From Swiss-Prot:
Pfam family, one: Lip_prot_lig_C
GO molecular function: ATP binding; lipoate-protein ligase activity; lipoyltransferase activity
Residue intervals of the BPL/LPL catalytic domain: 28-215
Miscellaneous: In the transfer reaction, the free carboxyl group of lipoic acid is attached via an amide linkage to the epsilon-amino group of a specific lysine residue of lipoyl domains of lipoate-dependent enzymes.
Quaternary assembly: Monomer.
Principal localisation: cytoplasm
InterPro entries, alphabetized: aa-tRNA-synth_II/BPL/LPL, BPL_LPL_catalytic, Lipoate_ligase_A, Lipoate_protein_ligase_C, LipoylTrfase_LipoateP_Ligase
Coiled coil: none
Species of origin: Serratia proteamaculans (strain 568)
Gene designation: lplA
Enzyme Commission number(s) from the entry: 6.3.1.20
Cellular compartment(s): Cytoplasm
Protein name: Lipoate-protein ligase A
Reactions accelerated catalytically: L-lysyl-[lipoyl-carrier protein] + (R)-lipoate + ATP = N(6)-[(R)-lipoyl]-L-lysyl-[lipoyl-carrier protein] + AMP + diphosphate + H(+)
GO CC, alphabetical: cytosol
Length: 337
């Protein structure tokens, strides 16, 4: 049996691909594994990130962009079919992320592209305009195994990074960066005819060359669940609101708006995706419905639909304030996504 394993996904579903990755990682033996894949339009966040802070969730919902939480750390990234994704897995002591980084750099060299590793998890290219990032990575280790996964920007729609990601201004300032868009680059700028299949072939060849052996590719089809232990359960988890949103760290959120009938300040404390405390302050001449709303919100999931349902119930209880509460409902629907 080969010491290597190569898997290639034909699915563009981020939840499907991340479930495949997780199941392979759980069941892996002593083989060195390479998994190649890509996602349709998705924002992928790190295991411990807060999507409401990191992403423009309202814009994502409007545009049909999925949110996917991965099992590794690191920051939020936007994927489309202009990205190629790779995952290297190995048992310890054979796991070494510098080896997998070297394989990616060698693959790029085969394509005529000279890149270097920078910082903890980036691959960059030196240009006349400065250093440009073309790849980002994240890592995960357990006691006996580890994986390194990342993306390569081929011809991604870089303008959409700003549409869906909320970059931390302190992080940008600390790195001396003016914007996310200005520091990233597509590989197509350096090799105009580059394609996902070219990149996959180059990474595969560099993988085989490094270890001095080959393995037949296993194609993962989106039409049939792969023969992986507990895949259906893992796919259901990766697809769930509870995993992608509800696993966010505890946080607080303040919303405020001025309506014709009065100003409203709403304070939320959210844990595990559910509202655990709500306070509403208003100068409305009829505050009773809003005081009741604060009570009703406790225990609701932090989703616009759940808050809208509370408002619907409130309108039934306070029909004389239906116009004001309908306006409040619409505002909450637009503000919380």
């Amino acid at each position: 049996m080969s010491n290597l394993r190569l898997l290639i996904s034909d699915s563009y579903d981020p939840w499907f691909n991340l479930a495949v990755e997780e199941c392979i990682f759980r069941e892996m033996t002593t083989q060195k594994i390479l998994f190649l894949w890509r996602n349709a339009e998705t924002v992928v966040i790190g295991q411990s990130q807060n999507p409401w802070k990191e992403c423009n969730t309202r814009r994502m919902e409007q545009d049909g962009i999925r949110l996917a939480r991965r099992s590794s750390g690191g920051g939020a990234v936007f994927h489309d079919l202009g990205n190629s994704c790779f995952t290297f897995m190995a048992g310890k002591p054979g796991y070494d992320k510098t080896v997998s980084t070297g394989i990616i750099l060698q693959a790029l060299a085969q394509l005529g592209i000279t890149a270097t590793a920078s910082g903890r998890n980036d691959l960059v290219i030196d240009t006349a305009e400065g250093v440009r990032k073309i790849s980002g990575s994240a890592y995960r280790e357990t006691q006996d195994r580890g994986f390194h996964h990342g993306t390569l920007l081929l011809n991604a729609d870089l303008n959409r990074l700003a549409d869906y990601l909320n970059p931390d201004p302190k992080k940008l300032q600390a790195k001396g960066i003016t914007s996310v868009r200005s520091r990233v680059a597509n590989l197509a700028e350096f090799k105009a005819d580059i394609s996902h299949h070219q990149v996959c072939d180059a990474i595969t060849q560099a993988f085989f060359d490094h270890y001095g052996e080959m393995a037949k590719a296993e194609i993962i089809s989106p039409d049939v669940y792969p023969d992986l232990p507990d895949f259906a359960a893992q796919f259901a988890k990766q697809s769930s609101w509870q995993w992608n949103f509800g696993k966010a760290p505890a946080f607080s959120h303040l919303l405020n708006e001025r309506f014709v009938w009065g100003g409203v300040d709403i304070f939320f404390d959210v844990e595990k995706g559910a509202i655990c405390r709500a306070q509403i302050f208003t100068d409305s001449l009829s505050p009773a419905p809003l005081q009741r709303l604060a009570e009703m919100l406790v225990g609701c999931t932090y989703r616009s639909e759940a808050l809208a349902n509370c408002c619907d119930a409130l309108i039934v209880q306070y029909p004389e304030q239906a116009a004001e509460l309908t306006e409040l409902r619409q505002w909450l629907l637009e503000t919380i996504k």
